[in-house]
From Swiss-Prot:
Residues 1-23 form the signal peptide. It comes from the Bacteria. This is Cytochrome c-553. Its main location: periplasm. Gene3D superfamilies: Cytochrome c-like domain (1.10.760.10).
Length: 102
């Protein structure tokens, strides 16, 4: 019984360590956004919409999800849709969190 607990403890520690290491890095992901949105998020992408700077993480996440599924955005949304649909929810949340702190 003691041996099983030791093995389970080791497995749990490894699992938590791996998931922490695999956590999405919003700052690293945002680097692909800098060209249109600016390093500090204050740039109006393609001259339309709002700058990401100053927006709340939950709103940014909703917008990213909307771009990914095509339910959000204006006439130029195809650019964002094609970029964002490759990201997981975890990555979009990490980006939204990072952008909300710009």
């Amino acid at each position: 019984m003691k041996r099983i607990l030791v093995v389970m403890s080791i497995c749990a520690a490894l699992a938590f360590g791996v998931s922490a290491a695999m956590a999405a890095d919003g700052a690293a992901l945002y680097k692909s956004c800098v060209g249109c949105h600016g390093a500090d998020g204050s740039k109006q992408a393609m001259g339309v919409g709002h700058a990401v700077k100053g927006q709340k993480a939950d709103e940014l996440f909703k917008k990213l999800k909307g771009y990914a599924d095509g339910s959000y955005g204006g006439e130029k949304k195809a650019v964002m849709t094609n970029l964002v649909k490759r990201y997981s929810d975890e990555e979009m949340k990490a980006m939204a969190d990072y952008m909300s702190k710009l």
